[in-house]
């Protein structure tokens, strides 16, 4: 299998598991196990720090909501249809 990354098409950013999920580099996958295989409810949850560069630059594209337990974070549920596999 060719290496690939998961790209969020509207922002051009890549998905990476962890606390901040959208980055310029993302994670390189070499197997079939990825965000598409373990998020099966039709959306991929993402998070960021409130008022960070990521948060402020994507406000018009992603509908961010404050998190209940971490006031310094925001989160969103992005439909899987907005992501694609991009081979490297």
PLM feature spans:
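Short aromatic-glycine-(Arg/Gly/Cys) micro-motifs in beta-strand/loop hairpins
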Residues: 1-45, 50-51, 56
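Short, mixed-charge low-complexity intrinsically disordered segments
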Residues: 37-88
